Amino acid sequence: MSGRRAAGARSTAGDVRLRAVRLIAFRGANSVAANEAGAILDATEVLMHELLGRNGLETGDLVSCLFTLTPDLNAEFPAVAARRMGLSRVPLMCAQEIAVPGSMTGVIRVMIHAYSDDRREPVHVYLGETAALRQDLHGAQ
């Protein structure tokens, strides 16, 4: 299988027009002010809203989300924020980043797998201090 599928879009006449879609990975990160549940949830919610909004994604497009946190963040699971946003039918997983000496701390990262228009290029989103991680990306702001 090629990793592509067709999604139907109904016209007003009732016929179905197919558009090509493919499975795409969308990346993003946000900085967290403190190792507190509220700070982790707020940063995650902002990150998810930005990623979904900038890429025109809806809940039904999502296949899965993988969240990671730097080792200094352990007060809450980022998936809790995603569930509160209505992603209750999307498989979510949380993991800890590798503790690389000198790496940025206080960071939540996410990789979203979603079906999107075949012609659309993913917009990766890096917010707050994490914009320094991927200055090569136009969406890193």
Over which residues does each language-model region extend?
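Terminal domain-initiation and capping elements
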Residues: 1-141
